[in-house]
Amino acid sequence: MHAELAEVAAAVSAAACIVGLRHARPGCARAFVAGALVSSVGYTCFPAIRHCVHMAARYLSYLCFVRGGATACVHSVADEAVQELVDSLHRVLAERDQCVLGSVELVQGSEPLVLGLPQAPVLCVPEPSGAVDPECVEVDLYCHENLRYESDVSEDEDKDDACDEGISLARQTLLDLLACSEDASGFSPPEDSFSSLLETGELYDEVLDASLARAEA
C-alpha cells in the first residue's frame, strides 16, 4: 500500500512540476512537490489521516463497484419486467382481436428514464368497427403509473372516448420486481397487480438499499 501511494505521489508531483515549468512558475511546482511529501509523511505517521484515506477509498469503491453492480442488476430485471408487460399486452389484445405495432418506452413524468431497455416491438392494430383491417399502424406504449394502450383516432372520432377504451394494466410493488433476487422474474398476471416501474425517482437508490439490507441480514 505504501509503495502504491509513493508511486501515485511521484506521478502527481511530476505532473505538477511539468505544469509549473510550462507556465513559468517554478514556485508552484515546488509547492506541489512539498505537498506530496507532506501528504506521504502524514499518511505514514498519523493514524487519523490514514483512516480518512481508507474511508475515502472505500467510498469510491462503493460508488464504482457496489452501486454499479446494483444498477446492472436493475437493468436485467427491468428488461424482463418490460418483456413481461409486452407479453401480457399481447395476450390481452389477442383476446380482443387486436394487435399493436410500435415500441415500449418507460417514462417518469415528462422525462424518459433510461434503464437499458430493449425496444420491444409489439404487433398491434386498432379494433376494427366493421371488417378486419389488415393494415397495422404504429403506436407507442408508455408506462407511467400503469401501462396503457390507446388506439389511434381518426379525425371524425372523439379522442376522449377512444382513450377511455384503452387497456390499462394494474401494478405491484416496485421492489417486488426490482429486488435483484432469484424470484424477481416471477411476475403476476395482468389481471392481478403489475408494477409501475417508475413510481419513484429514487429507483436505483431503493434497489441498492434493499440489496445492502439483505447482505447485512
From Swiss-Prot:
Domain of life, source organism:
Viruses
> What taxonomic ancestry is recorded?
Viruses, Varidnaviria, Bamfordvirae, Nucleocytoviricota, Pokkesviricetes
Q: Report whether Iron shows up as a keyword of the record.
A: no
Q: How does it assemble?
A: Interacts with host RB1; this interaction induces the cytosolic sequestration of RB1.
Q: Where is this motif: LXCXE motif?
A: 141-145
Could you tell me the keywords of this UniProt record?
A: Host membrane, Host mitochondrion, Host-virus interaction, Membrane, Modulation of host cell cycle by virus
> Which GO CC terms are listed, alphabetically?
host cell mitochondrial membrane; membrane
UniProt subcellular location: Host mitochondrion membrane
- Protein name (database record): Protein MC007
Instruction: State which gene encodes it.
Output: MC007
Primary localisation category: host cell
> Briefly, what is this protein's role?
Plays a role in the modulation of host cell cycle. Induces a cytoplasmic sequestration of host RB1 at the mitochondrial membrane.
Q: Which GO terms describe its biological process?
A: symbiont-mediated perturbation of host cell cycle progression; symbiont-mediated transformation of host cell
Q: Which organism is it from?
A: Molluscum contagiosum virus subtype 1 (MOCV)
